[in-house]
């Protein structure tokens, strides 16, 4: 079996098996057809981002994570939400700020007076697709809260390890032109990302298509899984 065929089989049987109806997978010829369906579905929400969508799916296939670096208004958040909806996957978003704590990401144990015991209050990382919005606005200490779950696919809270989600895919965003109130990503954090992508500003023709697409309502609201 060639590497390409192996990749198709992995896509169909491993990555999407827990997210998409198995009947849908069996009805497609292979994982490539399913990937094409996902890409087409995402294009109902985003205009002119076909290459980025393909690379995002490639990173998901490879069990990696993606850093989207671009100015505001290029569709970074919309892309993450559209992908999650297309896969019928769990989705969480963290808006990173300087006062965010690691426990706000992973979760904490909270004392329950009625039960007289500590119970886990899960953080946003307990999902399938996690959008780490403006990751570089958090301190390196807070950013480190993602290191373990991105690399080892587990979260350790008070000495107990938990599985965040299967699959677990992080899409982080950052604004490259900001200089005030931002922190450079540590090398250990950058090493967790398989790809660093740029969304790029839309062309004039794409702007007109976006205007037509969003004239009545946000198509993301009516987007359905593949």
Task: Show where each model-derived region lies.
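Walker B catalytic acidic pair
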Residues: 70, 133-134, 145
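Conserved beta-strand position immediately N-terminal to the Walker
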Residues: 66, 130, 168
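AAA+/P-loop NTPase substrate/partner-engagement loops
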Residues: 86-114
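Pre-Walker A (pre-P-loop) alpha-helix and adjacent loop at the N terminus of AAA/AAA+ ATPase modules
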Residues: 30-74
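Walker A/P-loop
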Residues: 60-97
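Conserved alpha-helical scaffold flanking the Walker A/P-loop in AAA+ ATPase domains
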Residues: 55-58, 111-131
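Conserved ASCE P-loop NTPase core motifs with emphasis on AAA+ ATPases
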Residues: 3-42
């Amino acid at each position: 079996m060639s590497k390409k065929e192996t990749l198709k089989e992995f896509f169909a049987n491993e990555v999407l098996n827990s997210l998409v109806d198995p009947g849908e997978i069996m009805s497609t010829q292979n994982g490539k057809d399913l990937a094409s369906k996902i890409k087409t579905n995402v294009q109902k929400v985003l205009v002119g981002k076909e290459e980025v969508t393909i690379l995002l799916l490639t990173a998901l296939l490879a069990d990696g994570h993606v850093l989207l670096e671009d100015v505001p208004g290029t569709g970074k958040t919309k892309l993450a939400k559209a992908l999650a909806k297309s896969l019928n996957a769990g989705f969480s978003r963290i808006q990173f700020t300087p006062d965010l704590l690691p426990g706000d990401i992973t979760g904490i144990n909270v004392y329950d007076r009625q039960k007289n015991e500590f119970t886990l209050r899960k953080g946003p990382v307990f999902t399938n697709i996690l959008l780490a919005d403006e990751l570089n606005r958090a301190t390196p200490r807070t950013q480190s809260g993602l290191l373990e779950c991105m690399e080892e696919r587990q979260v350790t809270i008070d000495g107990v390890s938990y599985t965040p989600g299967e699959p677990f895919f992080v899409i982080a965003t950052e604004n490259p032109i900001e200089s005030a109130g931002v922190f450079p990503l540590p090398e250990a954090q950058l090493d967790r990302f398989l790809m660093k992508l740029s969304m790029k500003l839309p062309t004039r023709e794409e702007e007109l298509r976006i205007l037509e697409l969003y004239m009545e309502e946000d198509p993301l609201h009516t987007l359905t899984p593949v």
